[in-house]
UniProtKB/Swiss-Prot annotation:
Keyword NADP assigned: no
Lipid moiety-binding residues (GPI-anchor amidated glycine): G112
Domain of life, source organism: Eukaryota
Protein name per the record: Lymphocyte antigen 6F
Bilayer disposition of the protein: Lipid-anchor; GPI-anchor
Signal peptide: 1-26
Name of the coding gene: Ly6f
Upper taxonomic lineage: Eukaryota, Metazoa, Chordata, Craniata, Vertebrata
SMART domains, alphabetized: LU (SM00134)
Pfam family of the protein (one): UPAR_LY6
Disulfide bonding pattern of the chain: C29-C53, C32-C41, C46-C74, C78-C98, C99-C104
Keyword annotations of the record: Cell membrane, Disulfide bond, Glycoprotein, GPI-anchor, Lipoprotein, Membrane, Signal
Subcellular location: Cell membrane
């Protein structure tokens, strides 16, 4: 009976370690600044402990000519949207969205990171394994 209890404890500790592993690695976000809307961005690991991934659509208006670009980055906090801000004769509109999951600032849904899907799978397998030990 003591051996069974030890096995359960080891499995539980392993599951907790695996579930916490992703945060120890840091949040991953796509990162690019001022690129055209169709251009892909590379991913980076954020250096900030409580980071958010940011996706921005920026519209620049100069003499009635419009140009749209995107920014994707990680940041320590979520900045506010900017509407009709005048900078040196240029009107700037920035639509910002923030999220806290790995690679969540993609232009389309990625279905989650590999680590997130692995954690869900391990959690399900671990719970089944614990039920069989009980």
């Amino acid at each position: 009976m003591d051996s069974c209890h030890t096995t359960k404890s080891c499995v539980l500790i392993l599951l907790v370690v695996l579930l916490c592993a992703e945060r120890a690695q840091g949040l991953e976000c796509y990162n690019c600044l001022g690129v055209s809307l169709g251009i892909a961005c590379k991913s980076i690991t954020c250096p900030y402990p409580d980071a958010v991934c940011i996706s921005q659509q920026v519209e620049l208006i100069v003499d009635s000519q419009r140009r749209k670009v995107k920014n994707k980055l990680c940041f320590p906090f979520c900045p506010a949207n900017l509407e009709n801000m005048e900078i040196l004769g240029t009107t700037v509109n920035v639509n910002t969205s923030c999220c806290k999951e790995d690679l969540c600032n993609a232009p389309f849904s990625t279905g989650g990171s590999t680590w997130t899907m692995t954690r869900v799978l391990l959690l399900n397998l671990g719970s089944v394994f614990l039920q069989t030990l009980l």
